[in-house]
Amino acid sequence: MTALITQEIGSFRKPDYLAKEFHKIERTPKFTELAERATRETLEVFERSGLDNIGIGGEMFRWEMYEHPAERIKGIIFYGMVRSFDNRYYRKGSAIDRLERREPFHVDEVKFVAGTTKKPLKVPITGPYTMMEWSFNDYYDSREDLAMEFARIINEELKDIASVWKQVSGGRRLEIQIDEPATTTHPDEMDIVVDSINRSVQGVDGEISMHVCYSSDYRLLYDRIPDLKIDGYNLEYSNRDTLERGLTDDKRVGFQDLKYFAQINESLQRKKFIGIGVTDVHIDYVEPVELIEDRINYALKIIGDPDLVRINPDCGLRTRSREIGEQKLRNMVMARNNILKQL
């Protein structure tokens, strides 16, 4: 099936037994044991929910999307904690020397998850522009230079993942998701965004998508779709939408940008898919199946081809309880299933 594939974006709330001990036991056999246990339990949640693509099992091996790779890069030191956009905190690093990988970021995680489930997977990895934007630069001549260095390192990581994937995939296609929440932070740096992402995925054989959330203007990204060497986009829309039912523009205000995406996509010889965020990860309110159906149907009215539309939460569900997260995913899949019956 390729129509309206349901997918998870990345993170999911860690069980308390892992979250409370994470930093105390990281990089020990005990950590591996608990992270593997949490991954198996989260995969069960995703499979109970009916997801087609179960990501990487909720990122149980990762504490935070910036800190995890930054800790594994030589040339970065950490100065302290800063607040992120979702009112959580991360350790912000600074590039003080030439960047080199100390060790792989996600290879062991990919091996474990691929060997634990036969479902399709998607490996999220923090993109070069966001790594640059969220770092201090005390070494390189320019922001562009730093972004391209992160791109070089990410390309090494992706090639290692691709190599391992051949051994553990069981015939499944490699799917990579470049996470770039900082994409449109500086409109005058979109050339850096494009060049660094293209460098990151150079020579990597597989399906490449890009995840962006909470952008003030997706049109900055859409304008560069012809230049980006990726296959699709998984984006946030529900956080900016209403909670009212309906298929009119005033009810589906959060999805208006899709019209511009469709216009750009129509001009391409090789069309890109769009993963639409149909449930808000920043509220505990569990959107009713009927509301999610309206959001999907509205998107289909704009995009047309259901093979070009995928269904996902706005972002990772780590900010919600595991129970709320599962309910949101379950309703999302139910809404998709209802629509498939009508197609």
Curated annotation (Swiss-Prot):
Quote the cofactor binding remark.
Answer: Binds 1 zinc ion per subunit.
**Keyword line:** Amino-acid biosynthesis, Metal-binding, Methionine biosynthesis, Methyltransferase, Transferase, Zinc
Pfam families from the entry? Meth_synt_2
Into which EC class is this enzyme placed? transferase
Q: In which pathway does it act?
A: Amino-acid biosynthesis; L-methionine biosynthesis via de novo pathway
* One GO MF term attached to the UniProt entry: 5-methyltetrahydropteroyltriglutamate-homocysteine S-methyltransferase activity
Essential cofactor(s)? Zn(2+)
What Gene3D superfamilies does the database record attribute to this sequence? 3.20.20.210
InterPro entries according to UniProt: Met_Synth_C/arc, MetE_arc, UROD/MetE-like_sf
Give a GO biological-process term.
methylation
Recorded hits in CDD domains, A to Z, give: CIMS_C_terminal_like
| Role summary | Catalyzes the transfer of a methyl group to L-homocysteine resulting in methionine formation. The physiological methyl donor is unknown.
Family stated for the protein in its record = Belongs to the archaeal MetE family.
Q: What is the designated name of this protein? A: Methionine synthase
- Biological classification of the source: Archaea, Methanobacteriati, Thermoplasmatota, Thermoplasmata, Thermoplasmatales
